């Protein structure tokens, strides 16, 4: 990574690529007990949040990620009532989850309270639901939280984490997935951000293998654009306890969803279920 008076550039070693943003100034920086969080003002992308030098989100394009990590899973589940979000400290995923009126409770557990406080200050539009009566914000270890979750008590677990290094490393292994499996009801869904399907298919396969070792039997990886992330193309992966689940979704409900989105639609959901041939081949779909 590098910065000068005009640009912030993140070098992403796993893909041998870099991404940069023209900046007009640095707004804030805080070193939490876990990581360094920085906020920049860009000239074209609104505000930019970095965690340990890695781009987390911008004002301009975060909706792709937040909508795709939440709505496909929520419309795939027959009637989601209790949702747990592990990570997600910027609160954008929580906001999308609570757009669904059938959700009765959404617990967000992020290890670093400072991420949420910085988001409330610089990305208040993402924090509209923080005081919703259905929302519970916890600042604790997500691995421990899932390990202590009551068996069969959760409809959807969303793992909205940073890359699998540092504080998030424990969210990408069999032990954590076993905790998720135990906490989910029989028709429950696990969904996790799964990096770039263009450059990191091996990592996606490793994730799915670890999920399978934990008991999950069916998987679906959904790609979507994410300009501020390496390669500009990202993904989430859904996992089900059911054998040969087709991940069909409640299309009528999605079409008549009754709330606004900037990217997600029922028609888009239908299309994204069909993986590009090179992705399908690599993932054995």
From Swiss-Prot:
Q: Which GO terms describe its cellular component?
A: cytosol
* Binding, spermidine: 66, 90, 160-163
What InterPro entries has UniProt attached to this entry? PABS, PABS_CS, SAM-dependent_MTases_sf, Spermi_synthase, Spermidine_synt_N, Spermidine_synt_N_sf
| Enzyme active site | 160
The highest taxon in the source lineage is Bacteria
Q: Which UniProt keywords apply?
A: Cytoplasm, Polyamine biosynthesis, Spermidine biosynthesis, Transferase
Q: Where does S-methyl-5'-thioadenosine bind?
A: 35, 110, 141-142, 167
Provide a GO biological process annotation.
spermidine biosynthetic process
Q: What does this protein do?
A: Catalyzes the irreversible transfer of a propylamine group from the amino donor S-adenosylmethioninamine (decarboxy-AdoMet) to putrescine (1,4-diaminobutane) to yield spermidine.
Q: How does it assemble?
A: Homodimer or homotetramer.
Membership in a protein family? Belongs to the spermidine/spermine synthase family.
Write the protein's name. Polyamine aminopropyltransferase
Q: Which organism does this sequence originate in? A: Xanthomonas axonopodis pv. citri (strain 306)
